[in-house]
Amino acid sequence: MIAAPLDAVADSKGKKPFYSHLYVQVLAAIAAGILLGHFYPELGTQLKPLGDAFIKLVKMVIAPVIFLTVATGIAGMSDLKKVGRVAGKAMLYFLTFSTLALVIGMIVANVVQPGAGMNIDPASLDPKAVATFADKAHEQSIVGFLTNIIPTTIVGAFADGDILQVLFFSVLFGIALAMVGEKGEQVVTFLNALTAPIFKLVGILMKAAPIGAFGAMAFTIGKYGIGSIANLAMLIGTFYITSLLFVLVVLGAVARYNGFSILALLRYIKEELLLVLGTSSSEAALPGLMNKMEKAGCKRSVVGLVIPTGYSFNLDGTNIYMTLAALFIAQATGIQLSWGDQILLLLVAMLSSKGAAGITGAGFITLAATLSVVPSVPVAGMALILGIDRFMSECRALTNLVGNAVATIVVARWENELDTGQLARALGGESEDTSTAGLQPAE
């Protein structure tokens, strides 16, 4: 676990000064990056390596964090049937809310119509601008995605940092440890001991988060400019507001039903949220999120299964974006889609969002995969939103992160693997929801 604050930085009341909190430092770094990128764009674009280097540092520890969390969690299970049960419940949750996110994006696009009146001639669009994404989309398939989960070698899975491959091996290894009983106890003891320095390393790496966030934000604003947002402000605003309402209303209702406050959860994971905002990478927050969910009372076995799987299958923000962006392109190019066309779009999106999971730029690639199958909407229309996709990706990643945090608590509660008292303490008990209603045990 990450070490407690040092006495040297504590004030007379035993609290850390506000500027020593990671979320304050990241927030300040984001603001500084925006200012530098806006006023000195050339310098801002040159700072891209800072963000890239930080993300690589975090990716370096993702595989061992997943392996240790999953393997030790499953090895400690007395009933191995729980592994299948947890995975099944998690997939049911993912399917339900991923589909709901797709439907919400479609409904909002029909009601708000952010692309109406643009009157873009599809023939004037440059298909070369999105050719790379379209090619990657054609390379993806459900069968290929599923077979790729199985690593060619154990070392290869860890070397490549493929989350699902590492998860696949970790689950099998954890089951094997549990099955050998006493013979595997020394291995479990070693892995448990190894967990402490690995999470300590995560804590050390997180100290560089402000530098990474500063460089990534300076690059984004320097390269694309704040002005690029204004050109498609309607789409960006619609997407951000829809995602915010999805988190507060839909996930908020799920949270309330399961005995905790979504606002309290957002406060609890604020450092991870700001990290995602600064780097536009949800992977950067994966180790910290897993650590915090375990500290919040979710059993390690549940955390280890739900969060890494959710990073590929529970992409609420990406799903809202897919249907909203697809209908925006249709509206902007003056293409009228029937309800039959939209239902086809929805069904294809449900499949393509899984087939391209875990790829860099997954949101844009899954959109290309969807449009390439639905003939009514031109794939070249993606050129309209290519310039603002970086700004959209931050909202996608933030929504995905919150969705996976909620999913972890819910699945843990369903499995009676949630310490509700510890959850209440972790979330702070500051919101009225948690202080008055309390946390009820799973039924």
Swiss-Prot record:
Membrane protein topology class: Multi-pass membrane protein
The entry's keywords: Cell inner membrane, Cell membrane, Membrane, Symport, Transmembrane, Transmembrane helix, Transport
Primary location recorded for the protein, binned into one broad class: membrane
A molecular-function term among this protein's GO annotations: fumarate transmembrane transporter activity
Signal peptide residues on this chain, from the entry's feature table: none
GO BP field: L-aspartate transmembrane transport
Localization terms from the record: Cell inner membrane
Transmembrane domains' residue ranges: 17-37, 57-77, 92-112, 139-159, 161-181, 201-221, 234-254, 320-340, 368-388
Pfam family, one: SDF
InterPro entries: C4_dicarb_transport, Na-dicarboxylate_symporter, Na-dicarboxylate_symporter_CS, Na:dicarbo_symporter_sf
Coiled-coil region(s): none
PROSITE patterns the UniProt entry points to: NA_DICARBOXYL_SYMP_1, NA_DICARBOXYL_SYMP_2
One GO cellular component term noted in the UniProt record for this chain: plasma membrane
Protein origin, superkingdom: Bacteria
HAMAP family for the chain: C4_dicarb_transport
Function: Responsible for the transport of dicarboxylates such as succinate, fumarate, and malate from the periplasm across the membrane.
NCBIfam families, sorted: PRK01663.1 (NF002461), PRK13027.1 (NF009587)
Family under the similarity heading: Belongs to the dicarboxylate/amino acid:cation symporter (DAACS) (TC 2.A.23) family.
Protein's name according to its UniProt entry: C4-dicarboxylate transport protein
Species in which this protein is naturally found: Rhizobium etli (strain ATCC 51251 / DSM 11541 / JCM 21823 / NBRC 15573 / CFN 42)
Upper taxonomic lineage: Bacteria, Pseudomonadati, Pseudomonadota, Alphaproteobacteria, Hyphomicrobiales
